């Protein structure tokens, strides 16, 4: 049957039982996004995705997805009708999200509240070493050191989840500003929380941007730690002459840092001084990448060919011989 992803024919002897048998076998494809309406002179019944899910494991339905186009109606055949595709896709995504949330809901609310950001760690620090250190403050539920996906090297920060909020506060008291492996670590609650707390992030972002003082003398800063706040960026540049303001740029939908920001100064001289002083300086385990905001890369000029007096005289003689 042309134009269809699959086809099958129902003969006069085909019964509804045999067709149901076909659909109750373990599928090699997903029909989660479709509603199948089957009509024939010998049978008249309807199968939709909700009923099919009673026969198929949900995990197998989500593992693969084959979208079936509408097949032409033929006599003694089966017509496949695609109904409310957008609603089916939205429903499917919603159901999948609910399943994932149920599977991931293994930690209590108190444990979630005990999640800490730990910055400026030694690059050689391991999860087990960090867990041993924080065990001084209480029960350590989880340790996640963040690694670069390309180099597989530690990015110098981690997230430590303590057994309770009280233990997390004790860890902040004990370790924030302390020396770990020769480095002064920073320990606090993450600026961007999980779950429903993200709803208040848009207001926080607006507040951060409103406090920013703009200036034509502005630096663009990249390669920022994901957990670095606008206040942290201001603190890093506060001692620079002519410093005015700084802000980290956040994604408005997720509330997460985009890894870059801007710093403003009162004059071009102050801006250039900070550029020379702070470029490549490490902040929370990552070297800053500074550039003048809006500055385009300089266009490379063609190489200058130097000629000696001897070459000039040789060229003159050659031109004279050619013209004569």
Curated annotation (Swiss-Prot):
Residues 114-192, 217-296 form the RRM domain. It holds the Pfam family RRM_1. Residues 1-71 form a transit peptide. Coiled coil: none annotated. PROSITE patterns: RRM. It is found in: Plastid, Chloroplast. Residues 294-324 are annotated as: Disordered. GO terms for cellular component: chloroplast thylakoid membrane; ribonucleoprotein complex. GO terms for biological process: chloroplast rRNA processing; mRNA processing. Keywords: Chloroplast, mRNA processing, Plastid, Repeat, Ribonucleoprotein, RNA-binding, Transit peptide. GO terms for molecular function: mRNA binding. Residues 298-308 have a biased composition (Low complexity). Could be involved in splicing and/or processing of chloroplast RNA's. This is 33 kDa ribonucleoprotein, chloroplastic. It comes from Nicotiana sylvestris.
